[in-house]
Amino acid sequence: MSSDKKQGFEASLERLEALVGELERGELPLEEALAAYEEGMKLARLCQKRLDSAEKRIEKIATPSGDEEA
């Protein structure tokens, strides 16, 4: 998972899309399909965490507060 943390959001999403494509084609042997599914679920959770974090940052920036005015 440490290599996942080093990947950027875009790279993780690109890998996830590739895995989905492989699974949708239905040509992978069972064990490879299971491994791809497992990796895909990890990437999906990682991407969701990053999106949630970005949303919180945006909300924090967009929320007016009196003590942060320039």
UniProtKB/Swiss-Prot annotation:
One of its GO terms (biological process) is DNA catabolic process. Pfam families: Exonuc_VII_S. The keyword DNA-binding does not apply. It is an enzyme of class 3 (hydrolase). Its EC number is 3.1.11.6. Transmembrane segments: none annotated. GO terms for molecular function: exodeoxyribonuclease VII activity. InterPro entries: Exonuc_VII_S, Exonuc_VII_ssu_sf. The keyword Hydrolase applies. It is found in: Cytoplasm. It catalyses: Exonucleolytic cleavage in either 5'- to 3'- or 3'- to 5'-direction to yield nucleoside 5'-phosphates. GO terms for cellular component: cytosol; exodeoxyribonuclease VII complex. Keywords: Cytoplasm, Exonuclease, Hydrolase, Nuclease. It comes from the Bacteria. Bidirectionally degrades single-stranded DNA into large acid-insoluble oligonucleotides, which are then degraded further into small acid-soluble oligonucleotides. Belongs to the XseB family. Heterooligomer composed of large and small subunits. This is Exodeoxyribonuclease 7 small subunit. It comes from Magnetococcus marinus (strain ATCC BAA-1437 / JCM 17883 / MC-1). The gene is xseB.
